From Swiss-Prot:
Modification after translation (UniProt): Activated by phosphorylation.
E.C. number(s) listed in UniProt: 5.4.2.10
Protein name: Phosphoglucosamine mutase
Gene label: glmM
Gene Ontology terms for molecular function: magnesium ion binding; phosphoglucosamine mutase activity; phosphomannomutase activity
Length: 452
């Protein structure tokens, strides 16, 4: 049976609408607490589980934090409160402090009126599907509050931000520093606002912070990785060397160079792979997604690096990295994984990896990406009748085959059905925009005629 509440990145929705309500989140805390308490070895040891709760800067975070805390306490689980903390910071602290689990209250790049809950295991990884299924099963059981002497306790984690700042700095090579560099750091009015500027400043950079005045309602609003225009303007206005854009929970990274040019996760993955090749001699493989630009795949293969596409979502990139035993993966949106540095995507750590690559090479981002020009993409969303059998259409198949034959080795076709509405997404990449447009429109026309 499929999961009812957990998606690819925890539980998420509009605050006040099910399931992001205080009563549900209290029960979620209780259910998660009971699963943790019954983990193998936990009951036998008699040790009380302890979880860490971090959050971003949404006004609803206070309400949901209190509800989670109450649920965990009712299940007999102790709670440590980190306050505003990037998602990767919660993952790191959970592992470093040897806690039972970590919980993040955040809806990442979404607007302030959304929020969500995601869990990390004791080793700093997102919970396996089977554990999330156990938690959902407990949600159907009565809430049986622990006796007074068995209730969980709650306390603030002293210097949570400072601990995470030191971890981030430790991932930057000791042989380098950032003295002489002017950086604009955009924290999206989100979870990294008390952390990211300090990391880069303490490593020697002249830091110009933006997006560091959260009021509970302005997270991701015209700032951050989902709205990089503000950063691009700030970099040019301040004559900065580089701009760093994080999202609301700081697990994404986009970078802007001194000219104001924006670099996405696909391009940054290529930069990091090239840096590893220069320092280690070779990189066996890297992981992208179905949406990774074809130019990056071509460039990596030309560099002798295997490339695998995962389903869209950093969870699936991580699965492929583990399956192949590789270290580097990314999504175009800015989720970058470097498993020799962290167990999850970390915008700050990823920025430090990019900065280290620039320091080692003595090149700019544009120079490191010389010869790699992203292919133009044409995306057309075609609305269909609900339940239309587009896969069984010979006309659609012929249109796809025709495009793939014409683009062989110089582009690709991706057809994806929306998971939430009767829409077929037709995406074509080609070296020339005219070719991408022509083939995408031909396929879209075939879809419209076959599914009308």
């Amino acid at each position: 049976m499929g999961r009812r509440y957990f998606g690819t990145d925890g539980i998420r929705g509009k605050v006040g609408d099910a399931p992001i309500t205080p009563d549900f989140v209290l029960r979620l805390g209780y259910a998660a607490g009971k699963v943790l308490a019954s983990a193998p070895g936990r009951a036998a040891s008699g040790a009380r589980p302890t979880v860490l709760i971090g959050k971003d800067t949404r006004v609803s975070g206070y309400m949901l934090e209190a509800a989670l805390e109450a649920g965990f306490s009712a299940a007999g689980v102790d709670v440590m409160l980190a306050g505003p903390m990037p998602t990767p910071g919660v993952a790191y602290l959970t592992r470093a402090l040897r806690l039972s689990a970590g919980v993040v209250i955040s809806a990442s790049h979404n607007p302030y009126h959304d929020n969500g809950i995601k869990f990390f295991s004791a080793d700093g990884n997102k919970l396996p599907d089977e554990i999330e299924a156990e938690i959902e099963a407990w949600l159907d059981k009565p809430l049986d509050c622990a006796a007074s002497d068995g209730l969980g306790k709650a306390r603030r984690l002293d210097d949570a931000a400072g601990r995470y700042i030191e971890f981030c700095k430790s991932t930057f090579p000791a042989a380098f520093d950032l003295r002489g560099m002017k950086l604009v750091v955009d924290c999206a009015h989100g979870a990294a606002y008390q952390v990211a500027p300090h990391v880069f400043h303490e490593l020697g950079a002249d830091v110009i912070p933006i997006g560091v005045a959260p009021n509970g309602f302005n997270i991701n609003d015209g700032v951050g990785a989902t709205a990089p225009d503000a950063l691009m303007r700030a970099v040019r206005a301040n004559h900065a060397d580089l701009g760093i854009a994080l999202d609301g929970d700081a697990d994404r990274l986009l970078v802007v160079d001194h000219t104001g040019r924006l670099y996405n996760g696909d391009e940054l993955l290529y930069v990091l792979v090239k840096d590893r090749i220069a320092t280690n001699g070779q990189v066996e493989g890297a992981v992208g997604t179905l949406m990774t630009n074809f130019a990056v795949e071509v460039a990596l293969k030309e560099a002798g690096v295997q490339f695998v596409r995962a389903a869209v979502g950093d969870r699936y990139v991580l699965e492929q990295l583990r399956e192949h035993g590789w270290q580097l993966g990314a999504e175009g949106s800015g989720h970058i994984l470097s498993l020799d540095r962290h167990s999850t995507g970390d915008g700050i750590v990823s920025a430090l990896l990019v900065l280290a690559a620039l320091k080692r090479s003595g090149k700019t981002l544009a120079q490191m990406l010389e010869g790699v020009t992203l292919f133009p993409q044409k995306l057309i969303n075609v609305r269909m009748k609900p339940g239309a059998d587009w896969k069984g259409s010979d006309a659609i198949r012929r249109a796809i085959d025709s495009a793939e034959q014409a683009l062989s080795g110089s582009g690709r076709v991706l057809i994806r059905a929306s998971g939430t509405e009767p829409v077929l997404r037709v995406m074509v990449e080609a070296r020339q925009a005219t070719d991408a447009n022509r083939h995408a429109e031909a396929i879209a026309d075939a879809v419209k005629q076959a599914t009308a």
